[in-house]
Amino acid sequence: MKTVKIALLGFGTVSQGTFNLLQDNVDLITNRSGVTIEISKIFVRNPDKYTNITLPSTAQYVTNIDDVLNDESIAIVVELMGGTTFAKDCVEAALKHGKSVVTANKDLLAEAGPYLFDLAYKNHVDLRFEASVLGGIPIIRTLYDSLGGNRITELVGIMNGTTNFILSKMTDEGLSYGDVLKEAQDLGYAEADPTADVEGLDAARKLAILASISFNRRIFFEDVTVEGITNIDTEDISFGKEFGYNIKLIGIAKESSKGLSLNVYPAFVPLTHPLASVRGSYNAIYIKGNGIDDAMFYGRGAGSLPTGSSVVSDIMEVAKNVAFESTGRFKPFYFDQKNIYSPGKIQSSYYMRLAVDNKTGVLAKFATKLAEQKISVLSIVQRNKDPETAVLAIVTSKCPHSYILNLIDSFNSLRSVKDVCSVIRIMEA
């Protein structure tokens, strides 16, 4: 049986999860892959931090990346450091040295994925990245392999566990955004600086990677229109329940004859849709294809062992390719023109919450403004906040986003409108 040597770059949460699975399941992994996978080197800045971890006799810590790159016996470099600068240098150098790479680095792939895939192909090595999106959910290989014969028309998902935890808590317990964010930070679900999660940036990077595979285009993070959850209020969630919706931060990529739309935003999801029941820190991705019809994949989107499981899966696959001298067969998957569809033209139904004067005749004025924008009202609820102020919650018919922006301006021009408090898209069932 052939032995394939690997090197781990970084030894943080995901890397240690990968290490533990490789050690704990060594017999299973060897029998299933037909290859002995041997950890040879672990690149770290300070080995003294890891004195409590017992390495196998084959492995050693190194502090110079050249000790990995120049070691011809190492066939696979597993990049688990994160970041887009030094990590990119390491991945690029490894590929040029004829080493296959496994990475969980979504930021790097969203920024430089097409270049790195081309580089891997030119050097006849593999670049695998299952763990870069949705952690333990095996969605990457599913898209380019299991669903390779399908024309994907739409993918929509809950791609960030932190925001789903926050919104689930706000929904289930009626807590404010600020209170739940603090709890998420205390539990380790959210970083001290939660910007990447709560502003939708993390989900946008994942969507860029998934859309690249699904629609065969060079999609970058900058192509995704992004809106976060920081303005979501418990009052909106309460109205949403009344209308039959749960609030979720979704990433959605959809192809039509007009082009490809790429968006991350908070949306009301109908309770009849499977994504509405995804709670806590779990992730899910819902796919529509012309062969599979509809399918949903659900699981842990982060964590040491769930993400490590996806990393090990890639290591096993690449190790088999190394053993049979068949690396570099994975051709870059983008061959169609990008043609991104303007966000202003995307049609959705919308929920709007307004604070207005509690007087007769106000609704008639709203009806006039709605008619001017050719927007119909599907549902409306009024709650009297105090003798002078009423709160209106409106669900509109489907219309382009540009129409809603014009409607907001029209509402703001009315003296009877005190505030357009929130505007939230409604996902189709």
Region locations from a protein language model:
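Substrate-binding/catalytic subdomain of NAD(P)-dependent oxidoreductase enzymes
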Residues: 179-277, 282-284, 303
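A conserved regulatory-domain signal marking ACT and ACT-like small-molecule sensing domains
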Residues: 310, 315-429
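N-terminal Rossmann-fold NAD(P) dinucleotide-binding loop
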Residues: 15-16
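Rossmann-fold NAD(P) dinucleotide-binding segment
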Residues: 63-104
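Rossmann-like NAD(P)H-binding beta-loop-alpha module
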Residues: 74, 121-202, 209
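NAD(P)-binding Rossmann-fold cofactor-contacting core
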Residues: 25-53
